[in-house]
């Protein structure tokens, strides 16, 4: 089996992981952890979400985190924006990269953002135009690609329509998210190969380990030529629509897999694991990842 020779991981724990934690993490602690992640060799780190602090108190210090971190020559910092105001905040804070998110499933769109898929698409077009005008690289994340309430309840035709619609708007990357962990290795390959027929924009996969198939799905994606993934330290994260669900596939688990396959990442896994252990101690509980306690 031929795999990519190199894989790029984006660490999303400081955003997608931290936002689910009710125990507020002090700004200086977040900054110290992120700085250690930078030193571990992670090429991309999603460090904040530009949302209302009442809705997500953990992200109330987004600008402060960015200001205290400054720049890191070897690492791209990005933030998640859910509306035009969020894009403006990301640009004003000095980020060079922003992640945007739209629904592919009508029920998920109304549950999560209070808007239809078409409304989300129109808003995304405005956000992309603003972000590119402000000089930021844009990644568009499409949610629940493999299903929302049950596997397959998001039409693949809609995913393909969105991939085509946004193929010539200047995106840096196009991310397919298994937001509720509905994918399996066969469906991963079916969707990835279909999307590749309609867009040349680089693909990123954002996989959750909700049902224990995260690593198997990574292997399936590698077999389909995907070489960029979102991962989260220690497996931090979750899904607001599935109580008790685990989060993103764990960074340490993915790095261990890639190392064992001879695929280069440039990441020092023991350094990431050290941060995860400190996060675990701070939160007072074990994390869902496997390797963070072993390396």
Where are these regions (language model features)?
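Catalytic cores and adjacent flexible loops of soluble metabolic enzymes
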Residues: 1-295
């Amino acid at each position: 089996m031929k795999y990519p020779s190199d894989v790029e991981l984006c660490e999303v724990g400081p955003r997608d992981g931290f936002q689910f934690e009710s125990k507020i993490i002090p700004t200086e602690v977040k900054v110290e952890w992120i700085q250690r992640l930078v030193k571990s060799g992670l090429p991309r780190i999603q460090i904040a979400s530009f949302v209302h602090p009442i809705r997500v108190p953990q992200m109330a210090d987004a600008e402060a985190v960015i200001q205290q971190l400054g720049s890191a020559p070897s690492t791209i910092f990005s933030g998640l924006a859910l509306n035009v105001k969020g894009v403006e905040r990301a640009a004003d804070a000095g980020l060079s990269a922003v992640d945007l998110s739209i629904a592919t499933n009508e029920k998920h769109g109304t549950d999560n953002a209070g808007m239809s898929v078409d409304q989300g698409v129109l808003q995304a077009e405005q956000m992309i135009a603003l972000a590119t005008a402000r000089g930021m690289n844009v990644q568009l994340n499409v949610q629940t690609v493999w299903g929302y309430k049950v596997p397959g309840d998001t039409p693949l035709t809609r995913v393909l329509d969105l991939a085509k619609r946004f193929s010539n708007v200047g995106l840096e990357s196009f991310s397919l998210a298994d937001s509720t962990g509905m994918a399996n290795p066969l469906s991963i390959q079916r969707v990835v190969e279909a999307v590749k027929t309609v867009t040349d924009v680089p693909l990123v996969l954002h996989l959750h380990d909700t049902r224990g198939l995260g690593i198997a799905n990574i292997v399936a994606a590698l077999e389909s030529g995907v070489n960029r993934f979102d991962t989260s330290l220690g497996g931090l994260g979750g899904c607001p629509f599935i109580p008790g669900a685990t989060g993103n596939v764990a960074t340490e688990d993915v790095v261990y897999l890639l190392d064992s396959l001879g695929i280069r990442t440039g990441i020092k896994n023991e350094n990431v694991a050290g941060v995860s252990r400190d996060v675990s101690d701070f939160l007072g509980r074990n994390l869902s990842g496997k390797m963070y306690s072993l390396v």
